[in-house]
């Protein structure tokens, strides 16, 4: 962080980091992000953060964690170790004291003594760390007040204007008193005040409501700046709550404007308001201030994109003339779109600086990812969004976002090929309803943002054009704007080097995904040469060519590389011992590929099912049982099923991350085939009385199968649970029923990987 405020725009734009550290309360339960992401137990994370090249970090020294029973019982060892480690690595901490919280159980956001109690804690922190210069005593006071006092999501679960305004006043007063207590120890301490900043757009009929929202968004900063009095546009609204005017006017006598205004900007920060509710999905309909209307993200409905964060930065600068920083830059999306979003935020900040806006930094938010923000942290569901590090491994694993951060911090040109494509928020398929044309949202797309939808991106070549897996990659690459090119054997025979070299020269891919192969396990016992050609020779040729041309390679292996003598899921490091020729071909492929290309990615998976073919086990079981016919499945062969969309998405993330070596990817739960059929039928509401369990030996298999081939991973559990996957599969099958009927009618049939 730049040390002198008058340096302004002479300093380069800085890259900061932020740790998702929310401790919010729902009823009497506290949800702690640091407990979920494991940082509470890992001092070694500091070294990981330092490796990103960040200059400053928004770092938690949280009231709820340190003083749950009062200031007399604080154990300072946790922040002592971590703040010391940050200083040793030259990273400036921006110390956060409350992050979407309501304090320990002995207070709350409606406690008249909340501000005094937080100020006492802030003073204790300053006494302990008198060198600390930058503070955010309360993160996002306006947003927290809305969620806790108006929407009823978090404690104290208010749903009225008075509770909303009172919780906002208490938090802002706490900021003032906390900074006063801190400055008694360190007079040079500086306030970095964060909040979400968006903008509301509307139809003409709702322009008054949009105007109200657009005035309300500034309210926390206005209070701290001493701008709220009878001249304020929301004065009548504020005093209509019944709160004494003196509580608002107190801030005029106790001005505590930030040294840096922190702008948190998300794809959901801006809103579109429309009274024509029949045009939109029902879950977006709401009622407020006498209106019934739709409230949703403009990006999903407006034909012309809004001006976005660059324009909002300029608005904040014109309003306050104080230095700014983007203090949260994150999007919950696939890996490439996370990178595209971060780069767009960085470019927007640079553009704003060129227009004279004093913006100091862009903060990459959620260095360790975040949990359950899809439900606004109202329940502990386990939904995880990774960030620069993915904590679903034994130790946090750097993703491609970390690589982009290092390039930005070092001033290098971002180099990842996926950055050549547009994010979903700029693509034609972003709409969830009929697009609305409006003059109120005027785009200011910078030329740097106008990256390609498909034309100029370097592609990913995908083999296996006739197979289920290859087609799935083609579908999902299209959904993620990754320019996948699906090739048949005629277009590229992977076992013929000249054919591979010709395709590589023609398409210039940055990655190749080998989704082809010999899949009939029983036929492989007599068709050995062909099996080994497709499953071992072909991947080894791809590996050699990819290594020579610096192309990333993803290829697939199988659970059938194991002998089944274990009674617990196999890990990547377990000894292989195939029982059949198919398994032997996969073992040989693994050996050859890694010999030729040590940076190749090999994914072992098993028993997959999905919505885009009608011949996988789960689909056949449900179809047969639904037709009131008998269906048999083995009771003594245990596998770990894999949902194809989950598999493909995780594989693409790992490929973008440049992961290498062998990974196991399944939806986790070991089940027998009959248990899988039973579980799926129950979820689909299909009668299971005609489901028969039989021993594997009764099915007349030619090739020997391992009795236990379930997979787990020591490298990372990346896929959702089997129950979650089956739920989504069944919903998808119902939605895809017309397409499935057309596929049956036309007689198309794809091969799948061996179960």
Predicted regions, residues:
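NAD(P)-dependent short-chain dehydrogenase/reductase
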Residues: 202, 591-639, 646
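Mid/C-terminal beta-alpha module of Rossmann-like enzyme folds, strongest
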Residues: 458, 648-651, 657-707, 730, ...
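NAD(P)-cofactor binding segment of oxidoreductase domains
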Residues: 526-554
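Catalytic domains of carbohydrate-active enzymes, especially glycoside hydrolases
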Residues: 40-62, 256, 260
């Amino acid at each position: 962080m730049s040390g002198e405020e008058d340096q302004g725009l002479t300093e380069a734009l800085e890259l900061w980091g932020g740790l998702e550290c929310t401790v919010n309360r729902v009823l009497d339960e506290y949800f702690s992000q640091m407990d979920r992401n494991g940082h509470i137990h890992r001092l070694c994370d500091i070294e990981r953060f330092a490796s990103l090249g960040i200059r400053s970090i928004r770092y938690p020294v949280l009231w709820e964690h340190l003083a749950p029973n009062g200031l007399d019982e604080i154990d300072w060892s946790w922040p002592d170790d971590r703040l010391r480690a940050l200083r040793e690595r030259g990273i400036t901490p921006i110390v956060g004291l409350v992050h979407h919280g309501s304090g320990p159980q002995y207070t709350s956001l409606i406690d008249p003594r909340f501000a005094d109690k937080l100020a006492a804690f802030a003073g204790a922190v300053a006494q302990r760390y008198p060198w600390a210069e930058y503070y955010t005593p309360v993160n996002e006071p306006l947003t927290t007040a809305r969620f806790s006092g108006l929407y009823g999501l978090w404690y104290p679960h208010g749903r009225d204007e008075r509770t909303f305004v009172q919780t906002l006043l208490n938090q802002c007063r706490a900021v003032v008193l906390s900074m006063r207590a801190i400055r008694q120890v360190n007079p040079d301490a500086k306030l970095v005040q964060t909040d979400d900043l968006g903008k509301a757009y509307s139809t003409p009929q709702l322009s008054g409501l949009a105007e109200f929202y657009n005035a309300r968004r500034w309210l926390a900063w206005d209070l701290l700046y001493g701008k709220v009095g009878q001249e304020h546009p929301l004065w009548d609204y504020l005093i209509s709550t019944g709160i004494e005017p003196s509580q608002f006017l107190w801030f005029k006598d106790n001005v505590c404007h930030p040294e840096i205004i922190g702008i948190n900007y998300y794809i959901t920060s801006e809103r579109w308001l429309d009274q024509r509710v029949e045009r939109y999905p029902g879950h977006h309909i709401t009622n407020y201030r006498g209106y019934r209307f739709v409230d949703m993200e403009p990006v999903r409905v407006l034909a012309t994109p809004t001006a976005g964060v660059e324009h909002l930065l300029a608005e904040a600068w014109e309003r306050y003339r104080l230095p700014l920083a983007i203090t949260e830059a994150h999007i919950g999306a696939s890996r490439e779109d996370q990178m595209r979003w971060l780069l767009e935020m960085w470019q927007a900040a640079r553009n704003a600086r060129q227009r004279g806006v004093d913006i100091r930094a862009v903060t990459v938010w959620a260095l360790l990812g975040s949990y359950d923000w899809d439900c606004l942290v109202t329940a502990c569901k386990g939904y995880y969004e990774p960030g620069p590090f993915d904590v679903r491994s034994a130790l946090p694993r750097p993703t491609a976002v970390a690589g982009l951060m290092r390039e930005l911090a070092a001033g290098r040109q971002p180099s990842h090929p996926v950055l050549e494509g547009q994010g979903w928020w700029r693509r034609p398929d972003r709409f969830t309803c009929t697009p609305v044309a409006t003059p109120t949202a005027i785009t200011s797309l910078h030329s740097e943002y106008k990256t390609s939808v498909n034309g100029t991106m370097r592609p990913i070549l995908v083999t296996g054009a006739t197979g289920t897996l290859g087609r799935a990659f083609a579908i999902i690459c299209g959904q993620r704007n990754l320019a996948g090119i699906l090739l048949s054997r005629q277009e590229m025979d992977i076992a013929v080097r000249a054919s591979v070299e010709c395709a590589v020269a023609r398409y210039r891919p940055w990655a190749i995904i080998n989704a082809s192969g010999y899949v009939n396990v029983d036929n492989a016992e007599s068709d050995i040469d062909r099996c080994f050609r497709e499953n071992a020779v072909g991947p080894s040729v791809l590996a050699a060519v990819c290594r020579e041309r610096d192309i990333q390679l993803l290829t697939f292996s199988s659970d059938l590389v194991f002998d089944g003598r274990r009674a617990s899921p196999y890990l990547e490091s377990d000894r292989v011992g195939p029982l059949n020729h198919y398994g032997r071909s996969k073992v040989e492929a693994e050996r050859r590929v890694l010999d030729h290309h040590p940076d190749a990615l090999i994914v072992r998976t098993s028993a997959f099912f999905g919505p885009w073919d009608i011949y996988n086990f789960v689909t056949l079981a449900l179809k047969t049982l639904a037709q009131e016919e008998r269906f048999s499945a083995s009771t003594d062969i245990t596998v770990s099923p894999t949902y194809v969309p989950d598999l493909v998405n995780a594989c693409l993330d790992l490929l973008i991350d440049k992961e290498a070596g062998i990974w196991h990817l399944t939806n986790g739960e070991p089940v027998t085939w009959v248990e899988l059929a039973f579980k799926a039928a129950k979820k689909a509401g299909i009668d299971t009385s005609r489901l028969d369990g039989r021993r594997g030996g009764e099915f007349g298999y030619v090739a020997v199968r391992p009795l236990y081939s379930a997979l787990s991973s020591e490298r990372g559990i990346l896929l959702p649970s089997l129950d979650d996957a089956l739920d989504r599969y069944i919903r998808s099958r119902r939605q895809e029923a017309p397409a499935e009927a057309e596929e049956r009618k036309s007689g198309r049939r794809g091969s799948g990987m061996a179960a």
